[in-house]
Amino acid sequence: MLHLVDFALLKPYLTVEEIVEGARKAERLGVAAYCVNPVYAAVVRPLLSRVKLCVVVDFPFGALPTAARASLASKLAEIAEELDVVAPIGLVKSRRWADVRRDLISVVGASGGRVVKVIVEEPYLTDEERYRLYDIVAESGAHFIKSSTGFAEEAYASRLGNPVHSTPERAAAIAKYIRERGYKLGVKMAGGIRTKEQARAIIEAIGFGEDPTRVRLGTSTPEALA
């Protein structure tokens, strides 16, 4: 199962030493990718050989202007194999779909062919918003729909009737939409995945097998899934 895991250390208070130790753990466990904030990309790069480097873009709010997001993605693509890009959540909630489309096409296009996972922040979305956003993610050329930053505000999510953590039901719904639309997208679930039982249930709910090009699980505690 670890070959499907993106080990993420993204808390703002983590030290350089903790990020370096995380890289060593990632290599030791043999996860799919080690995901860090942009400031640590150059530090982590030489520490990884069998594990891919993943860097987040405009995390966790998706609130930078498109030009800044695209420029950052372009620079990070010189270092990292994978980019986890937060969708422009405010534009999504404003239902400014043309702006969302322009943004994601620009950012993915600037990513130099690297694997791009677009974080749609499921806890904040209505069904209408999420399905429109999935369509735009597919159109942008991204490779994965990623469910959440793991930083979503529970009070707002609960107003919409959404959980803040990953669930098999949400994973199944994303995968079902991808299948029905014929999209070649993977599914990455993140947020609250802390046991092997949870992870297994989510993998089975997605139904894409155990192919790391189609399925990923984001967690800050990968040893719990070993």
Curated annotation (Swiss-Prot):
Sorted alphabetically, the Gene Ontology BP terms of this entry are:
2-deoxyribose 1-phosphate catabolic process; carbohydrate catabolic process; deoxyribonucleotide catabolic process
User: Which reaction equation describes what this protein catalyses?
Assistant: 2-deoxy-D-ribose 5-phosphate = D-glyceraldehyde 3-phosphate + acetaldehyde
- GO CC, alphabetical: cytoplasm
Q: Where in the cell is it found?
A: Cytoplasm
Sorted UniProt keywords: Cytoplasm, Lyase, Schiff base
User: What EC number(s) has UniProt assigned to this enzyme?
Assistant: 4.1.2.4
UniProt main location, coarse: cytoplasm
Q: Name one GO molecular function term.
A: deoxyribose-phosphate aldolase activity
- Supply the CDD domains for this chain: DeoC
| Residues of the signal peptide | none
Recorded superkingdom? Archaea
Q: Which NCBIfam families match?
A: deoC (TIGR00126)
Please give the function described in this protein's UniProt entry.
Answer: Catalyzes a reversible aldol reaction between acetaldehyde and D-glyceraldehyde 3-phosphate to generate 2-deoxy-D-ribose 5-phosphate.
Q: What is this protein called?
A: Deoxyribose-phosphate aldolase
